[in-house]
Curated annotation (Swiss-Prot):
Pathway info: Cofactor biosynthesis; adenosylcobalamin biosynthesis
Pfam families reported for this sequence: CobD_Cbib (PF03186)
Family: Belongs to the CobD/CbiB family.
Transmembrane residue ranges: 54-76, 154-173, 301-318
Subcellular location: Cell membrane
GO biological process, any: cobalamin biosynthetic process
Lineage top rank: taxon: Bacteria
The protein's role, per its UniProt record: Converts cobyric acid to cobinamide by the addition of aminopropanol on the F carboxylic group.
Name this protein carries in UniProt: Cobalamin biosynthesis protein CobD
UniProt GO MF annotations: ABC-type vitamin B12 transporter activity; threonine-phosphate decarboxylase activity
Its membrane topology: Multi-pass membrane protein
Keywords: Cell membrane, Cobalamin biosynthesis, Membrane, Transmembrane, Transmembrane helix
Gene: cobD
Length: 319
């Protein structure tokens, strides 16, 4: 059974690299989004919003976990091969390496030819900030920050939970992440209602985000600005500057490896937001840096997969 579980994870990774998220295939996240919207419209009002937000999170996680457990269990009961196929498809739906790579490349291509209008438009699909006035450097920064943050959120974190608990736990992670992305804002409407989703998403991302940031530095020795020990200290110091307890690890590591500075001034619906800068680089970012961030992501994800199997093998050997 353990062998089937490992085969499902590897197959899921290959499926995502090959197919990504084809539009013709029903995606669990779409269902999660509809479920969250349904409960949010009914519960995000009146008193006890924080408590209702906790109820939203628990309800969504219970439904997603119960359905995935039942589907995986029934599939394995029919046949081991069917179980592996179903579990692989479910795990693949939680990771987005191909989608992230393609989205970043969609920004890099027009940026490389100085078509800033098209590059801004493509960037607006993957970031929440205003993009209509961004110059070449800021467009590249937006794409690089997206790749860096989502290397963990969109790829390594779901793989981490897939190793621990298979497709059901990977889907629980993705459901939490979806709740956070939909209601985990700090504005008046969601400050209380989205509190539980945001906090639980932080908890689930704490370990994989740090492993991902450290692996980025470990796997790219030639890109590091300093010896490993010093680089790790720089990583920890720079990551703390990010307002998120987890996103800073991937972004700080990427900034150190690309020799650029991430963070700074962003504008959201005309409102300026200042964020601490991470990294020590001074060069202006270009489309080439976006391509290099994708290469760093790909190598880090492969290294993370190897790390997970080594960790899993060690735990299996001592238990």
């Amino acid at each position: 059974m353990i062998a089937c579980h490992v085969i499902a994870i590897v197959s899921a990774f290959i499926l995502d690299k090959w197919l990504g998220d084809p539009k013709w295939l029903p995606h669990p996240v779409v269902g999660m989004g509809k479920l969250i919207t349904y409960f949010e419209r009914r519960w995000n009002c009146g008193r006890w919003r924080r408590e209702k937000g906790v109820l939203l999170l628990l309800t969504v996680l219970l439904i997603v976990t119960a359905l995935s457990l039942a589907l995986v269990w029934l599939s394995y009961q029919v046949h081991l091969l069917l179980g592996v196929i179903v579990e692989a498809l479910l795990i693949a739906s939680t990771i987005a390496a191909k989608g992230l790579k393609e989205a970043a490349e969609e920004v890099a291509r027009p940026l490389a030819t100085r078509n800033l209008l098209e590059a801004r438009r493509k960037l607006s699909y993957i970031v929440g900030r205003d993009t209509d006035q961004l110059d070449e450097k800021e467009i590249a920064r937006g794409a690089i920050e997206t790749v860096a943050e989502n290397t963990s959120d969109g790829v390594t974190a779901p793989l981490f939970y897939a190793l621990i608990g298979g497709a059901p736990l990977a889907l629980l992670y993705r459901a939490t992440n979806t709740c956070d992305s939909m209601v985990g804002y700090k504005n008046e409407r969601y400050r209380d209602f989205g509190w539980a989703s945001a906090k639980f998403d932080d908890v689930l991302n704490w370990v994989p985000s740090r492993i991902t940031g450290v692996l980025m530095l470990l796997l790219h020795r030639k890109r590091r600005q300093a010896p490993l020990g010093q680089s790790l200290k720089m990583l920890a110091r720079e990551a703390k500057k990010h307002p998120s307890p987890n996103s800073g690890w991937g972004e700080a590591a990427m900034a150190l490896l690309l020799h650029v500075t991430l963070g700074g001034t962003n504008t959201y619906q005309g409102m300026t937001s200042e964020r601490a800068k991470m990294g020590y680089g001074t060069k202006a970012m270009t489309a080439k840096d976006i391509d290099e961030s994708i290469a760093i992501m790909n190598r880090t994800v492969l290294g993370f997969l190897v790390f997970l199997f080594l960790l899993g093998g060690f735990i299996y050997a001592i238990t």
